């Protein structure tokens, strides 16, 4: 049975990757279908009710700069906002928001329902239709076939998902949802390497049974940050506190006593869990010298009594979970409303993907999110946007696009995955980016919005706002460079009290701002130097560009050197055994990874600069040197 309409792009899955993928393809004018097993769970926050953080906030800002929905939904759902690393340099500052689950889901669903070119349909997908190594559609659980030349799979943890609580386990995509068994079996027939990963979630606690007076209150920031470049503080709902408590030796003894019934430590779970978000069992085992671990007590929303205890993800049996929770200060009488659990699921080796997130073996088939071995809403959303965009570009007969490592954290994410692969759930950190001074949260729109407009991702309202911001920044920078103060100026007596060293020679306003003791806000408040920019984001940009100009310029010079051969393309059908001078190890690694560019090849472990030189000579001799997009 065939559906009565044909589509350009089909997106399978309605989580964070799927929603961004569907919205991106539709924004670009492609007739898009989003298939989900349950319309009510579109945009669901399956684990932690929070968006952003170190590295992750950078991804959210980049999604936003390209017209995505995640940051906007966070501004409407965020019940506590904080800027992490606020005392450090701008490269590692990151926005994090605690979100109301219900409000977030409602906003995402509202955005989806109002998106032109997007159809949403409730049906689980069981099969792919492939013809001559090209995807041509999907078949749902009830045998309904949908046709499209491009399909984006965002199956999350649903592929052969298995939920573990103690030594009990059952099939599930997440608590309360069925797994995708038939689709998982179909995907295992494809020539793509497959593995198993696991992730987990903590028990949810009834807030009415917690004694918050025994915990440390953690308030949000003042003034309140916003997540979206189009956001406003007025969009935020009521703001509330989170709380901090700690495990103790009694907690650790309870956990150790239950390890014989832990699926992780009894060999029941084979999948590898996230290194940077370990279960409490893992923490006790790996950090046995620590007598306590911090727990963030995070409300799940304004109209629910559920609390998310961030830091005690566990798959221990329920009785052990209850005892360990009640051993924690402030939770002596706590009641669990949902048990914690681990979930094991299929993922596919991202080295079998192009950097467009299209599979190398099946044309038109794109993967995004946890199916590629990542963990986190933000990582999923970034991949979804990229995959949806490239699916639309392909249907429109245009070249694929992916930002380079020096252009976006999205570029770092995709390059790491497609070049190096991953054996554990991959999480983004600022430390993964070698050019992080240029990849800041504050300039994500400056880096990406113009490209997003060119690709058709950015609407008129965002473009107008961005253009106005760019113009005001440029005009203010010109003003600061062109206005000067002389030692005998009447402004000097007003200015000198604010300086560590009094003015002794002619100086531009820009030079004054570059002084360590001066900032933009302070300078603009001094009579004769203001009023300056009213837009705080534009003002922040002016300050950073002036104060860090030397460092930024040096990093840009490094990038210019590095990209010389970065985009030199490598034929996917090149047999590296035919390249004279390469060692057997290098040949094996290159034939296994099949890198798309010289840049990707150079980042594969064990590939030496000498091997890269040999490759370049070989390509030149055979007239194969080409530059990719």
Curated annotation (Swiss-Prot):
PANTHER family the UniProt entry points to: GLUCOSE INHIBITED DIVISION PROTEIN A, PROTEIN MTO1 HOMOLOG, MITOCHONDRIAL
Designated name of the protein: tRNA uridine 5-carboxymethylaminomethyl modification enzyme MnmG
InterPro entries from the UniProt entry: FAD/NAD-bd_sf, GIDA_C_N, MnmG, MnmG-rel, MnmG-rel_CS, MnmG_C, MnmG_C_subdom, MnmG_C_subdom_sf
Any single biological process term in GO: tRNA wobble uridine modification
Assembly information from the UniProt record: Homodimer. Heterotetramer of two MnmE and two MnmG subunits.
Gene name, Swiss-Prot/TrEMBL: mnmG
Binding site for FAD: 13-18, 125, 180, 370
Gene3D superfamilies listed in its UniProt record: FAD/NAD(P)-binding domain, GidA associated domain, C-terminal subdomain, tRNA uridine 5-carboxymethylaminomethyl modification enzyme MnmG/GidA
Leader sequence residues: none
UniProt entry keywords in alphabetical sequence: Cytoplasm, FAD, Flavoprotein, NAD, tRNA processing
Described function: NAD-binding protein involved in the addition of a carboxymethylaminomethyl (cmnm) group at the wobble position (U34) of certain tRNAs, forming tRNA-cmnm(5)s(2)U34.
Recorded family membership: Belongs to the MnmG family.
Molecular function via GO: flavin adenine dinucleotide binding
UniProt lineage: Bacteria, Pseudomonadati, Pseudomonadota, Gammaproteobacteria, Alteromonadales
Organism this protein belongs to: Shewanella sp. (strain ANA-3)
GO cellular component, one term: cytosol
Record-linked PROSITE patterns: GIDA_1, GIDA_2
One Pfam family, short name: SAM_GIDA_C
């Amino acid at each position: 049975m065939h559906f009565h309409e044909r589509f350009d792009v089909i997106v399978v899955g309605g989580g964070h990757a799927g929603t961004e993928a569907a919205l991106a393809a539709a924004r670009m004018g492609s007739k898009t279908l989003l298939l989900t097993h349950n319309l009510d769970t579109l945009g669901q926050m399956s684990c932690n009710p929070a968006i952003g953080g170190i590295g992750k906030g950078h991804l959210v800002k980049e999604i936003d700069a390209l017209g995505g929905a995640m940051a906007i939904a966070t501004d409407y759902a965020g019940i506590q906002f904080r800027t992490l690393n606020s005392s450090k340099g701008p490269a590692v500052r990151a926005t994090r928001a605690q979100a109301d689950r219900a409000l977030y889901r409602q906003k995402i669903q509202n955005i989806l329902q109002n998106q032109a070119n997007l159809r949403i349909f409730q049906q689980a997908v069981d099969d792919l239709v492939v013809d001559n190594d090209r995807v041509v559609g999907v078949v749902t659980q009830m045998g309904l076939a949908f046709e499209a030349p491009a399909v984006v799979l965002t199956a999350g943890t649903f592929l052969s998902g298995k939920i573990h609580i103690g030594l009990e386990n059952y099939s599930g995509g997440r608590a309360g949802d069925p797994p995708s068994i038939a689709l998982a079996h179909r995907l295992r027939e494809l020539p793509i390497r497959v593995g198993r990963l696991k992730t987990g979630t903590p028990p949810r606690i009834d807030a009415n049974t917690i004694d918050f007076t025994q915990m440390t209150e953690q308030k949000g920031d003042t003034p309140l940050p916003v997540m979206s470049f189009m956001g406003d503080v007025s969009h935020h709902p009521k703001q509330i506190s989170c709380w901090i408590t700690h495990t103790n030796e009694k907690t650790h003894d309870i956990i150790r006593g239950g390890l014989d019934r832990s699926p992780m430590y009894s060999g029941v779970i084979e999948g590898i869990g996230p290194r940077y978000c370990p279960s409490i069992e893992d923490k006790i085992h790996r950090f046995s010298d620590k007598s306590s671990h911090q727990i963030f007590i995070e409300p799940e929303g304004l109209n629910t009594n559920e609390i998310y205890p961030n830091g005690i993800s566990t798959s221990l049996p329920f009785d052990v979970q209850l005892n360990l929770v009640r051993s924690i200060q402030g939770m002596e009488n706590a009641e669990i409303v949902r048990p914690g659990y681990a979930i094991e699921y299929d993922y596919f080796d991202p080295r079998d993907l192009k950097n467009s997130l299209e599979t190398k073996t099946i044309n038109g088939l794109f993967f995004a999110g946890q199916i590629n071995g990542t963990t986190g809403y933000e990582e999923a959303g970034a991949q979804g946007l990229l995959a949806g965009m490239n699916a639309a570009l392909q249907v429109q007969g245009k070249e694929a696009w992916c930002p380079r490592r020096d252009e976006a954290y999205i570029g770092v994410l995709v390059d790491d995955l497609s070049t190096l692969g991953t054996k554990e759930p991959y999480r983004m950190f600022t430390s993964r980016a070698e050019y992080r001074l240029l990849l800041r949260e504050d300039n994500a729109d400056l880096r990406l919005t113009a490209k997003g407009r060119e690709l058709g991702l950015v609407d008129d309202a965002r473009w107008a706002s961005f253009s106005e911001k760019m113009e005001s920044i440029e005009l203010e920078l010109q003003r600061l460079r062109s206005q000067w103060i002389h030692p005998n100026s009447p402004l000097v007596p007003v200015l000198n009290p604010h300086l560590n060293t009094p003015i002794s020679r002619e100086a531009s306003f820009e030079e004054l701002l570059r002084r360590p003791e001066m900032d933009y806000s302070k300078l603009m408040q001094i009579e004769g130097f203001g009023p300056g920019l009213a837009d705080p984001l534009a003002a922040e940009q002016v300050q950073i560009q002036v104060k860090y100009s030397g460092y930024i310029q040096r990093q840009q010079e490094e990038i210019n050197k590095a990209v010389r051969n970065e985009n030199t393309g490598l034929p996917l059908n090149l047999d590296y055994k035919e390249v004279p001078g390469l060692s057997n190890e290098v040949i094996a690694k290159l034939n296994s990874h099949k890198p798309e560019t010289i840049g990707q090849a150079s980042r594969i472990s064990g590939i030496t600069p000498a091997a890269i030189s040999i490759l370049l000579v070989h390509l030149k001799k055979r007239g194969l040197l080409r530059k990719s997009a």
